[in-house]
Amino acid sequence: MVAEAGSMPAASSVKKPFGLRSKMGKWCRHCFPWCRGSGKSNVGTSGDHDDSAMKTLRSKMGKWCRHCFPWCRGSSKSNVGTSGDHDDSAMKTLRSKMGKWCCHCFPCCRGSGKSKVGPWGDYDDSAFMEPRYHVRREDLDKLHRAAWWGKVPRKDLIVMLKDTDMNKKDKQKRTALHLASANGNSEVVKLLLDRRCQLNILDNKKRTALTKAVQCREDECALMLLEHGTDPNIPDEYGNTALHYAIYNEDKLMAKALLLYGADIESKNKHGLTPLLLGVHEQKQQVVKFLIKKKANLNALDRYGRTALILAVCCGSASIVSLLLEQNIDVSSQDLSGQTAREYAVSSHHNVICQLLSDYKEKQMLKVSSENSNPEQDLKLTSEEESQRLKGSENSQPEEMSQEPEINKGGDRKVEEEMKKHGSTHMGFPENLPNGATADNGDDGLIPPRKSRTPESQQFPDTENEQYHSDEQNDTQKQLSEEQNTGILQDEILIHEEKQIEVAENEF
């Protein structure tokens, strides 16, 4: 399929490679079983075709790659061995011309990263293909055979472990623990763990025994390895951890166990896929829901800047899109090409997903408008206005308080005038006068004015002040007259006593 530069076609809009067909004629039914040629070919309808291009490609490649051409195993005249190794220079040349492989013709090979085609679908799934080891008996020694097939009695296996190194590797860098874990021989795994073998040795794909056990769905062996302290976060050559393989296998129990033993839920592989993004890309709805409950990052980005929502839209999974929208995910985020999830949905003609995104956007708009017209905010505004009014009234009160001393001064002047009329300013007051007024205070014995702290609206009228001061003056005058009377009585008593003394002296 030849795509335009910078475009990102959806999975449902993949077209057949007519450009290559026109050169090769009709496709070989064995190599490309779903692609039967173009109607525009100059080849007849009988099925005959010019296969010179196919022969040339075969002669260069030798044996077909089983991942790219699973039904066509090459020519018996090839000088390539039976291991399946081949010269892939022609395949690389073909990739450079075609860009992205047609998913019908090449179901397992997704093209080259150097292609001019956009990043959609440019993921190599070969890491998840054929999880089990390819084992040949002649390549294994006694210990590795016993670990793989597990048919050796326990006593013989113990003797075997004493005589040989339990961490010995074969040609593919696999230990006995790798082989036993991948094939589910839990008794051998337990015996090796009891003998304290090394846990984190890597094979030729940089995978630990735990990674192989999870990849091959051998949960019992994987749990035993986790209990003995195997590191669950060691990535293989593709960047995948054990959790990535558990998510790919939709093994929720294994994923839960890995998280319980410290697996990183945000670890990324070489494509920038976290376990959540991998689950979305592979349309594993149940494990996606599981990871969302485990608080996986919904805004994580792959190497092309795509979120989980964009991946779900590109895959055409309406159920996962609906699941992500329930989490209030950001629908306006763009990838490195500047496209949003809605733009992908429109270009791929995913009408159901377009409707889901439109409904979600309308709900968000209504929510924002309701928040803007919130009555609580109106109450806050009214309370702020009232507080401003109160502040204004408080600012006016000091002016009223400043007028009080003038009023008090007027009342003091009236008191002084009344005192002058009665001549009280020239009298000496005793020390026990009310309000503590004395002649020594420098006020000529006058009563000091009382300062009122009440506002102007609460002060007494002028008539009441005059009555108060006149009553106070009458009391002082009464007190003075009483003191004068007592002085007269004391003088009379003294005079009477002097007369008695004189009478007594005359008698003597």
Swiss-Prot record:
Question: Which UniProt keyword terms apply here?
Answer: ANK repeat, Repeat
**Which sections of the protein are ANK repeats?**
172-201, 205-234, 238-267, 271-300, 304-333
* Entry-linked SUPFAM superfamilies: Ankyrin repeat
Annotated region Disordered: the residues are 367-488
Cite the record's Basic and acidic residues compositional bias ranges: 377-392, 406-421
Against Pfam families, the record matches this protein to: Ank_2
Start-end of Polar residues biased regions: 367-376, 476-488
Recorded family membership: Belongs to the POTE family.
Name of the protein in question: POTE ankyrin domain family member G
Q: State the organism named in the record.
A: Homo sapiens (Human)
Gene name as annotated: POTEG
